[in-house]
Amino acid sequence: MTDSTYDVPRVRTYLQGLQARIADALGALDGTPLATDAWQRGPEERLRGGGCTRILEGGRVFERAGIGFSDVAGDALPPSASAARPQLAGRGFEALGVSLVLHPRNPYCPTVHMNVRMLIATKPGEAPIFWFGGGMDLTPVYPFEDDARHFHQVCKDALDPFGAELYPRFKTWCDEYFFLKHRNETRGIGGIFFDDFSEPGFERSFEMMQSVGDAFLNAYLPIVERRAALPYGERERDFQAYRRGRYVEFNLVFDRGTLFGLQSGGRTESILMSMPPVANWRYNWQPEPGSPEARLSEFLVPRDWV
C-alpha cells in the first residue's frame, strides 16, 4: 500500500464493463432484463459521486439479483476501513467497485456474492495510498460437493497466474472472514477473499482483480444451470428462508462492506440490495438428524475443495 502510481479511469472503465457483462448474462439466463437505476450524490452531501444499480426482483431463476457499481469519495475513511490501519484514519478517500449478491428462487441453487474494488486514501502533502480488495463466496442451502469443487477450482485458476500462494491464502482468509461467530459456523462453503492488496504494484494488482472479476460467470453460472430445474416443494422453500436468516445476520452484524457503506453515508437502497427477499427465524430449531437439511452442517466448516 505504498506505491502511489495508479490509474482510476482504467479501473472505472473495467468495473462498469464487468457490471454490464454480468447483468447481460443474468438477464439472458433468467429471461428478464435487469432494471437500471443510476444515481448521483450532490456535492454538499457527506459522500460524493455516484453509481448504477442493476436489479432484478421476482424473476424466473432469481428471486433477487443485484449488481451495484459505485464510485464515491469522502473526506474521512469510515472506521470499518481504517480499523486495521489506524495510520489512515481521517484521510480522504475514493472507493470504486462492483458488488453483487444473487438469491435464486430454487433452494437447490446457492446464493452467491462477488465483489471487486479499489480504494485510494489521500492526505494533503502526502502521496496517495491505494489498494485492491474483493473475492467471491458461495452459500448453498442444499449443498453439492461437485458445485463446491467447481467453484473453488475456478477461483484457484483465476489466482494461480499471480502466484501459487494466493489461492490458499485468500481461501483461508475467506473461511475466516465469512464466519458467524455467534453461530460457530461459516456462512457457506467459502471461496476467496482479499483486501489491502497492492504488493506487486498497480498493474499486476489490477490484473489480479480483473482475473477474479472475469472468473465470476464461469464459477457460478454452470452451477445454476445444473440446479435451477430441480424439483422442490414447501419444505425446501421453508429451509431456504431459514438459512437466509443467517445471511442477514452476517451482513448486518459482521460485513465490512455493509458497515463501510452505512458509516460513510452511502446509498442505503444499494447497500441493502444484498438482503434476501424472504427470510425467517425459528426459536431453537434443529433439523431432523439424517435429513437433507441436517447434511448442510457438514459443509459449514472449512474444507479443502481442490
Swiss-Prot record:
Gene3D superfamilies: Coproporphyrinogen III oxidase, aerobic (3.40.1500.10). One of its GO terms (biological process) is protoporphyrinogen IX biosynthetic process. It is found in: Cytoplasm. The keyword Lipid metabolism does not apply. Pathway: Porphyrin-containing compound metabolism; protoporphyrin-IX biosynthesis; protoporphyrinogen-IX from coproporphyrinogen-III (O2 route): step 1/1. The active site is at H113. This is Oxygen-dependent coproporphyrinogen-III oxidase. It comes from Burkholderia ambifaria (strain ATCC BAA-244 / DSM 16087 / CCUG 44356 / LMG 19182 / AMMD) (Burkholderia cepacia (strain AMMD)).
